A protein has these predicted regions:
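Nucleic-acid modification enzymes, centered on SAM-dependent nucleic-acid methyltransferases
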Residues: 1-332, 343-378, 392, 416-418, ...
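Short, glycine/acidic-enriched loop or turn micro-motifs at the edges of active sites
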Residues: 340
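Residue-level preference for long, well-ordered alpha-helices that form the structural scaffold
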Residues: 381-385
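Substrate-binding/catalytic lobe of Class I Rossmann-like enzymes that use SAM or dcSAM, i.e.
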Residues: 404-431
Length: 431
């Protein structure tokens, strides 16, 4: 709870979350914005114009012919009109699912311009047959797109909350973005820029490059992001740096979980008015629109609790974290989460968190090896995969004490992989 209070306190001191009328920003909704090559208009990239199903809120695109861009208004719809308006708002998104990757907009309501997003990105194949595009690779110090970038980003809606007299409840309101909101955005961006070097030196922000890989190629290819910090917008970097500064060994799991729920990859769930976690499907999927949590909403994540399980009096315990194939010490209990064939590349996903922890971790974690050790990951399917697992479980079996146990975490849709487990674990005495 102290961690959440510290986050809210520092955000309040900066004056970047309150509107001056008693409302605090709960969720900030952002989307990509691109220039249509046919019309020259800047177009927000929105798969749907539905903002909230529960509150019956939609966005409206308001053409501005002078600036050749769209203002975005926010409208509450009455219950009687909602089914029809919801259907219309779903269809009027600029990147509707039915168009399958095509940007669609009509400044005058008559002429519709359609352009493939692949064309806007400048997708092509190089001489070696690799997929490429014209997106600029971000520099390490970039925290927002540069003016000349193909993919811009804009704030298009803010959900505000205000405490009510009824304990534990808050009033909610979705609003269009105002000039005051944009000024607060500018203040956040400039503040982060001014402190970027100091925060990096103190280990409060990631300085790590994204290494090429099956999952990690996606944000590099689809957004031009080159460093892990690029997966976070200025508000998210600010919140992350504050949490990181106040983090202890006990609160580290909650801080890392907060990062999972607050990044440029966090889906805005219009059905539940929630900013979703990134790793709901163990991937690094980029989003055309996403949600950012304000401090009060992010505080819900860092206020989590872990149930302690004290050891019996006189019993000492040591927790070790090593690759199974390198295990050489005796142990009593083992928890292992083996690779899911080729389905989940944990060694790549770990780097999302390693980037935040490797510099200046809490004292209790100083001895940890902050490296994903990709080369050591047992990968693949078939005979090579099974042999790798047999070697790993043989080593675990050889070092387990009498009466010890292994907790195996494994989920997969492949019956063939499940069928291989008896040969990998059961026959090694680990079943």
């Amino acid at each position: 709870r102290e961690l959440a209070r510290a986050l809210a306190r520092e955000m309040d001191a900066l004056g970047v979350e309150r509107d001056g009328r008693g409302w605090r920003g709960r969720a900030y909704l952002y989307c990509l914005e691109v220039r249509c090559p046919q019309s020259g208009w800047m177009v927000p990239v929105l798969p749907t114009l539905v903002i909230s199903e529960g509150h019956r809120v939609v966005a409206r695109l308001v053409p501005d012919p002078v600036r050749k861009r769209y203002d975005i208004s926010i409208e509450y719809v009455d219950a009687a009109r909602w089914p029809e308006e919801k259907k219309r708002a779903e269809a009027q998104g600029t990147l509707p699912r039915a168009e399958k990757g095509t940007l669609v907009h009509s400044p005058d309501g008559i002429t519709a311009y359609r352009t493939r997003m692949s064309t806007i990105r400048g997708d092509y194949r190089d001489e070696q047959g690799n997929n490429r595009n014209r997106l600029r690779p971000w520099e390490k110090e970039d925290i927002v797109p540069r003016p000349e970038d193909i993919l811009q980003e804009r704030l298009y809606c803010v959900q505000w909350i205000r405490e009510t007299e009824e304990a534990g409840r808050a009033e909610s309101q979705f609003r269009a973005v105002t000039e005051a909101d944009l000024e607060r955005e500018r203040r956040v961006t400039e503040y982060v820029r001014a402190h970027l070097a100091d925060w990096e030196a103190a280990g409060l922000l990631p300085d790590m490059k994204i290494e090429a890989g099956y999952n990690t190629n996606q944000p590099m290819r689809e957004r031009g992001w080159t460093h892990w910090r690029h997966l976070f917008n200025p508000r998210q970097l600010l919140a992350g740096a504050i949490l990181r500064r106040h983090m202890t060994a006990e609160t580290a799991p909650f801080v890392m979980n907060a990062l999972n729920w607050n990044a440029r990859l966090s889906v805005w769930n219009k059905g539940r008015d929630t900013v979703q976690n990134i790793f709901y499907n163990q991937a690094l999927n980029t989003q055309n629109n996403y949600g950012c949590r304000g401090s009060a909403y992010l505080g819900n994540v860092v206020e989590g609790r872990m149930s302690p399980c004290p050891l019996p009096e006189g019993v000492a315990a040591e927790v070790l974290n090593l690759p199974a194939e390198q295990w050489e010490e005796g142990y009593d209990f083992c928890v292992t989460d083996p690779p899911y064939g080729d389905a989940v590349n944990y060694e790549e996903i770990y780097e999302f968190f390693i980037a935040w922890m490797r510099r200046n971790p809490p004292e209790e974690f100083r001895g940890w090896i902050w490296d994903s050790r990709r080369a050591l990951a047992v990968k693949g399917t078939g005979e090579g995969f099974r042999k790798g697992m047999v070697r790993a479980f043989r080593r675990l079996s050889e070092n387990m004490s009498s009466g010890g146990s292994i907790t195996l975490m494994f989920t997969h849709k492949s019956g063939a992989l499940w069928g291989g487990w008896p040969g990998s674990s059961g026959r090694r005495g680990c079943g």
